[in-house]
């Protein structure tokens, strides 16, 4: 009996010994899931597009800082991003699993940025249990380092003026000045984030560094540039209506709508339609590109981080101009001066018209993704499938960005000038980020 007993005891000890020494495997799939989880929370909590860009960028930066420590491929963003001057050093002999620590940092920073913290915690706890069961020692060491980096990023994040802008005065609508923005149907919401240009930039010198060309002067003269641009929106809207809902212009407009403030009226009740933000859509494209290219964990984090930095900067630059020029939306001027029954294909979002946010951030994102994955990277975009829309194929990131930009014209919510100048603005931002940030060695 004794030999059998000792053999059994040895087998048990060997099992637990091997289990303890097994390194925890963290994959790109885990990181995609973490970003997807944040996107889903934003659908639940309904954050504005500018605020959503902030929720995406800081967790990604936290994760990137972890994987950049002692890396032979990536450089820390320390002293590259405004105000980010120190990151806790990583002891290469401490046994830290950097992928695990990166995810810990991402989740910890995410939790502070959303309302539904319990959703982050549920996702986090499921990973923590799996990791702890695999190798508790490695998990605890790695978690501790991830939390240290997260705390440093949260401290830096807290100085970006976001909290201060929550207390600033609401936007005042100037109805006595012709051509100024006014709230639009159906909800007639207040203008969102009128002080977003006060948020600290990450790479840009200031919110106005890439100030676009001045907006068109308001004029109802039928020979004026402004009047003809209004008429162009009116005419394309009527033309699309005649073609019907199955036409390509409708498909393009709906695919890139990305308006978290879209509402549906039923009787006396108003319901919000669940839609991702424009930044959320481009985060989805990062996922698609990373998966198609079989990017490893580190490159996946790098792609999300660099793209989310571009989106964040794009919103600050774009919003700086929106509330400088305060341009009236097509829907308002068409209803007042041309056709009181005309409606745009898409609901008009609640902020001034110039420049087109989709044009700015999509162009910037495409430039950054070209830099990471190469030009002419074809892909199938299935980001909108959960929202009842089909896939769309694109020959390149630039192809997708141009379609995103023109979608706002088809949707009846932007003039051509806003789209064209927004593309130029986004190009300037994207080129600047690519040239200034040295994230790879």
Language-model-detected regions and their locations in the chain:
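Acidic/polar surface patches and capping/hinge elements
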Residues: 19-441
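Bacterial Sec-dependent N-terminal signal peptides
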Residues: 1-25
